[in-house]
């Protein structure tokens, strides 16, 4: 009995010592979040990458792992965020306005009441690129031409239609409208399969550089009657295409057009702590963020709070109130 008791005592001591020396590690649960962007040659994709890079630097602090997905663009991103397939999406400011108000693609579904704004990013110019040999000097010259206006469901498609209609051009009857993704248009233009294309994009853009660097010479076309557009649609503003980024274009001066802003949206169902972390890391590392793409050169903390139509997510609002940035919200 004594022998058995001694063995039991030794076993108990060993077990206790083992627990003290090798405690079971507590592993923090990682929350995976995905940002929906756009084509890989546009600015949305690197924008999502820039946000993810900043946030992932503190992944051990927040327990958040951020990834990026190339998507069909704004409309897809809104719908994917609303369905829970994405936690965040980069969306044109006009599409944010339309979604929260139940307009355009959301007319049948109605207002997307759970859509929430986080912040805005770079300005995006509605850019019209035409081949020099296609005889297109003005937007009126697009009549009878083969023009890519953007894939169905993309923000740029509606921008293209608005630009055409304000100038008296019906995209269904006055031209041969193609509906391919913006990233494919430069190749089609260089191959001679289209005469021109619209692209709503921040500058500089890899896709636009591709279009202007080919053997077929191209130029940018002014879009007139912008005052009528901005009066009718509150989310549009005057903009320009900066020629300095595109040495291959045959233009000599910047080109007038109109534009929107890229915005980051999420859902009301995404936890406050996740949205707070994303907001805090981007704004706390604002100077580093600005260096991640030339399109961010014009950013200020103040103008990153302009152009939002949906309610601000509580997680983002918490950060803005903590830092006093909420005074810039309109």
Residue positions per predicted region:
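Bacterial N-terminal signal peptides that target proteins for export
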Residues: 1-11
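Boundary at the C-terminal end of the N-terminal hydrophobic targeting segment
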Residues: 26-30
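Bilobed "Venus flytrap"/periplasmic-binding protein-like clamshell domains
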Residues: 32-58, 120, 124-191, 306, ...
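Pocket-lining segment of extracytoplasmic ligand-binding domains
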Residues: 93-95, 104-105, 134, 171-264, ...
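Ligand-binding clefts/hinges and TM-proximal coupling segments of bilobed small-molecule sensing domains
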Residues: 145-162, 236-308
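An extracytoplasmic/periplasmic, membrane-proximal ligand-sensing/linker region
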Residues: 184, 191, 201-225, 231-232, ...
